[in-house]
Amino acid sequence: MAHKKGTGSTRNGRDSNSKRLGVKAYGGESVTAGSILIRQRGTSVMPGVNVGRGKDDTLFALTDGIVKFESIRRGLRNRKRITVAAAE
């Protein structure tokens, strides 16, 4: 006979590391070329003028300038777009 109660096993008890997604440069901020503007999954924010898109949908600045967010009408829903305006 067992002298201790057997411990059960569980299939839970693990978690993934956070991916640190989100906006990295907000509207009105000045950025340099190559700066990451937004880390995202999918294109919830579309790239605009002077903004590139990486293979993981990360948006980054192509030139130095000021970050600007804008809302654009696309079909029945509004989409967000981020642009980098050249600094004067």
Curated annotation (Swiss-Prot):
SUPFAM superfamilies in UniProt: Ribosomal L27 protein-like
Pfam families noted in UniProt: Ribosomal_L27
Region (Disordered): 1-24
Annotated keywords: Ribonucleoprotein, Ribosomal protein
One Gene Ontology CC term in the entry: cytosolic large ribosomal subunit
Keyword Hydrolase: no
Keyword Ribosomal protein attributed: yes
One MF annotation (Gene Ontology) recorded for this entry: structural constituent of ribosome
Biological process per Gene Ontology, one example term: translation
Family per record: Belongs to the bacterial ribosomal protein bL27 family.
The protein's name: Large ribosomal subunit protein bL27
Source organism (scientific name): Synechococcus sp. (strain CC9311)
Gene: rpmA
